[in-house]
Amino acid sequence: MKAKQADAVLVLENIVRKFPAGETFVTVLKDINLTIKRGEMVAIVGASGSGKSTLMNILGCLDRPTFGRYWISGKETASLSADELSALRRNHFGFIFQRYHLLNELTALGNVEIPAVYAGYAPEVRRKRAEDLLTRLGMRDRIHHRPNQLSGGQQQRVSIARALMNNAEVILADEPTGALDKKSGQEVLRILDELHQEGRTIIMVTHDMQVAERADRIIEISDGEIIADNVSKVAKTKTDSQALYGKQVLKDQKTLGFFRSFAERFREAFVMALLAMNAHRMRTFLTMLGVIIGIGAIIAMVALGNGTREKILENFKSLGSNTLTILPGKSLSDPQAEKITSLVEADAEALSKLPYVSGVTPQMSASSTIRFGSVEADVVIAGVGEQYFQTQGLNAVQGRLFDQKSVHDRAIDLVIEKEALAVLFPHSHESPLGKVVHVGNVPVRIVGVIDPQHNGGTSSTLQVYLPYTTVQTRFLGTTQVRAITVKIADTVDSNLAETMVRRFLIMRHGEEDFFIRNSQLFRDRIMESTHILTLLVSSIAAISLIVGGIGVMNIMLVTVSERINEIGVRMAVGARQSDILQQFLIEAILVCVIGGGLGILFGMSIGGLFLLFKAPIHLIYTIDSIILSLTFSTLIGVCFGFSPARQASRLDPVVALSRD
């Protein structure tokens, strides 16, 4: 470093800055050598396009030189990372812009606090500091006003307070009076003079010589070169007797620890995300809509799958869950099945003694008619044992079911389904119990009524139940059994039980002249089909959610483009790349999480419609599906919000500040 002065705060050596212009480069700064001492008030003067603003950007670490070396308080900046440069801007520099660059969503107080948020000061410390600065700048009654409620002079004073927030050693003022009337401009210059009197280093960029003459030193730049560097003949007295703007205030204040500092920056990003969403409510809602529909559809489809599964299980209870049905032959289509007579009542008695069997009932059937008075209808007679109703999960809604004595005595006890009441007794509201009806030519007495069995068929023929012994003797004239239903104990696996029953009957018959239908296998196949269908429909819903995520990415890219100036301001006052990334990522996640919450409500409202219209299937919601949906919507926000947020964080501060 050429400059050996102990009081040198900024030193530039052979600085060159080039910008690409098509296939060539334009040189804006040419071999700049400059030393600025601590406590100087320097004015950089030049015409528009002379390179003075580019020089200020390099001085303030908003831009990097193409060639050359730059020291700040003895530290060379060439090898510093983006976050290290942001730390320099945060701790050493305060920027006063011609266009103020205040954030419209924040109050004057909020704008002034921003640098201290990124510096990690506690909320109460930075709030008091901001209030003190605004009060000393004559803004006490405007603390809670937003920028659009302030005049140009007032906005510039807020900008000055923001520049002083972190006790900046160097104040960089770019055309500080350029957008102000004469009175406001003089007030700003007076404040800069006071800051200079406190011992701060003031660097003003201006094209107005009257403004420049207030400085100790005037540097003229033309066509990217310093053509004059004159020291003012009028010496100014510096004093530290009155620290009007609290130069020492933050020296005794400790910054927050890493985690608390991160939490404060997260809170700031969260609040800004809410403010940004509120500023564009309709656009935010339309962006959420894709997420709402996608999450709602997934929630509803999963709930529908759960409801369908429960309905199937309920229907299986009426068909008999965990049961084995033993039939003669090799299969239902075996033409020799009718000739096989080896399946007998003794098999049922033997099976009932097995330890893993909780119930056994022989079965047979016959077709006939049922008649009461002048009413006659076709029926299927089911001859069953007393345990049949238990194995099928059927209970009497009126009267009783026949018992072992009824089976043993070949009783003429008849159990009918509830649907048969309207057919046999269309004009009577009396109890059917005890009434005698004719099944075929056999008079039988109604002893009980059950709910109809859901067998999945579409036949309209009524079904009635008699003891199988009665059917054998009164209707079929044979002791042959056409089927045996075995109820397996709930603690036993039905597939294992099926294997054991098969071996047991082969030992009894000497051959496998029967086949077994396992209700569990049938149930599993239907459940698998239901699961596949639910997965298919949920996949379609997930695609709509992904489309919604693409919409979030699109809007976030638009948001970054619209708020590029805000990004530049935040970087200028010390925001790290991670702070910018966090802010826009939180906004994307927030859009998706709120959309996910609304989507869950939407999905639940679909279940309400099912109840309202008395659909046969009810939607069953689970906490797992709700948590999964919220997690999925959060991941959508992270995945589709990361790219725009990363793009925002990688912006060059000087490029961002130059965009409106």
Swiss-Prot record:
Annotated GO CC locations: plasma membrane
One GO term of the biological process aspect: response to antibiotic
What protein name applies here? Macrolide export ATP-binding/permease protein MacB
Please give the subunit comment from the record: Homodimer.
**Gene Ontology MF annotations:** ATP binding; ATP hydrolysis activity; transmembrane transporter activity
Report the principal subcellular site.
Answer: membrane
Compartments, record wording: Cell inner membrane
Question: What topology does the record note for this protein and the membrane?
Answer: Multi-pass membrane protein
Q: Which residues form each disulfide bond in the chain?
A: none
**UniProt superkingdom:** Bacteria
Name one matching Pfam family: ABC_tran
Q: What is its EC number?
A: 7.6.2.-
Q: Which UniProt keywords apply?
A: Antibiotic resistance, ATP-binding, Cell inner membrane, Cell membrane, Membrane, Nucleotide-binding, Translocase, Transmembrane, Transmembrane helix, Transport
Q: Which residues form the ABC transporter domain?
A: 10-248
Protein's job:
Non-canonical ABC transporter that contains transmembrane domains (TMD), which form a pore in the inner membrane, and an ATP-binding domain (NBD), which is responsible for energy generation. Confers resistance against macrolides.
Coiled-coil ranges (or none):
none
